[in-house]
Amino acid sequence: MKTVKFFLGALALAAVSMFTAPAVNAQEDGNRDENGKVVRGPYLTNQFGDNWAVGVAGGINLFMDGGFKTAVGGALDVNVTKWVTPAVGGRLGYSGLTGAEWSDASTALGTVLDDSKNMFKQKFGFAYVHADVLWNISHAIGGYKETRLWNFIPYAHTGWLRTYGRAGAEFADNEFAMGLGLLNNIRLSKRLDLTLDVRGILTNGRHHAYVGGVAGALQTTLGLSVNL
């Protein structure tokens, strides 16, 4: 339960910035009709080949278990996004690289006791292949504007998470995972966006050779997205 509360609390803090932006974005000109009202639709849906983007990012993974014992690993994020309307889109992605968690017991992922913590550090690699449903709240509330500087995009994700041993450790596990996230798109040019993505992941505690329970991870990445 502590993991779930931590997960929800972290996302709530990330979401504060999301709700401070729409009022400002709505004041921008260029997305208003002849009466000065913000245009929020309806929109013509685009063709399959329109409004795609590819992105790559790097950052950190913060894994935790029910006791708030956390450890940091490196994160790599690669994704492809398709916007169906200005406010609704889908994304397929790979997230992963390295992870670590503290455990009270020795497992296949960690057998050396850390005397300062009286715990065993579990080190592993992981790959999370996921599908996301995106909602651009800036366009949904403030109306579509191509030149908007900052877009706030909450999303839900689900997918397959594979964990494997590092440094010769013999371990592999596959689990269902899901969660919520907040994507910030900052416009650099017509074709290029700076991205800041905060993602919470929930999965089974077995993923790091622990028996049962719920495990969580908070992933934060900074990267670039190219609009095709």
Describe each PLM feature range:
Residues 1-45, 228:
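Cleavable N-terminal export/targeting peptides
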